[in-house]
Amino acid sequence: MRWINFSLPGSGRQAYGTLDENDQVREIRGIPWAEHEFTGQRHGLSDVKIEVPVVPPTFYAAGLNYITHIREQEALAGRKVNVPPQADIGYRAVNALVAHEENVVIPEDATHIEYEGELVVVIGKKARNLSEAEAMQCVFGYTIGNDVSERVWQRADRTFWRAKNSDTFKPMGPWMETEFDLARAQTRVSVNGEVKSHFDTGDMLFNIPTFLSRMSRNLTLYPGDIVWMGTDGHSPKLDHGDTVEVDISGLGTLRNTFVRA
């Protein structure tokens, strides 16, 4: 099932709904992973504004989780390839989230912006101490993220506080899908209509159950939490006016334009 978080232009009202194959949104009262009911109202997709699928209680990020991306980042830093020995998790900031079709604002002092197309896991149940066999039971669904990064800041700063978390640096959407075949999924990232990255979405060093199981040994996972699963391949430098599309088969396409502040 495809779930969309939307608002109605001019009214300020925001709600969730299901999206069908005819681009009709069937509105609910409540949230998808908890108690809810259909209101009887329907909207055309073209008549609503798509919002960020969820503003999470906690925003997790897997980081280096695909081998080609690891090799690229280590080469840029002048280091030998160091493959992570275990599934360690990081954090991102919710202030950076923007929705499908919203602009990514390049800060005035930023000099090297890149995209990172990622699969995003949405948690649907409170969970602690999960085995890998149990881990997928807490997953509600999936969406798409673009982990926008300023590479100069990433290398120069002690943390990723601005390189990864500046306002608008985390586009996510356009919706959540509960039925998703990771084994068949392909991730393609295009800049101005030209494919720049293409990889098997499931070709991760550490898969989703491994991450969720390891995380839940020390952290309680809550409904609405999100886990970004990393990216692969090379990302070109982006400039003012570039439009980036992250397409994951079975999920859809996340589209954002980059503009200089």
Predicted feature residues:
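N-terminal non-catalytic cap/leader segment that marks the start of a structured domain
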Residues: M1-V83, F180, E194-V195, E245-D247
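Catalytic-pocket segment enriched in acidic/His residues
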Residues: V48-P53, H69, R151-A261
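A generic local secondary-structure boundary/capping motif
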Residues: K49-E51, A77-R79, V104-I113, A127-E134, ...
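RNA pseudouridine synthases
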Residues: N65, I123-G145
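Structural signature of FAD isoalloxazine-binding scaffolds in flavoprotein oxidoreductases
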Residues: G78-A99, Y115, E245-S249
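Ligand-binding beta-strand-loop-alpha-helix segment within the catalytic cores
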Residues: H100-E102, D109, G117-L119
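Residues embedded in well-ordered beta-strands
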Residues: E118-V122, T143, R188
